[in-house]
């Protein structure tokens, strides 16, 4: 999101980074009338950089926690989105999947995650990890919530 919100991928290396425009999927959500509340924490660089850090950890945001059990790993790099929906903080969220980053938080937070086929949703404006695997998906507390959000962003 471009609204004077830093885009750091959870890393101090991008401290102060402001983007000139919304990611295409964010623009599509706005055009569909969605009220966007902000950004959620994620694993640094949307990936596990070392085995000594758990999923959901970033230098900027610390360790994301499961809303059901603070000692459990919330799963995947999109853990903040999954945990936020699981905690009923918001009805839907976006997540990017390269290798389990939508599926794992959905499973661990008892929510619905839609991981689309690569290319079905735009990655324009998303910090890339893998051109052949990255895809933007949705989370919802219910299937209806996840599908409504997905319907707004697919191309």
PLM features: residue spans?
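A short core secondary-structure module
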Residues: 117-155
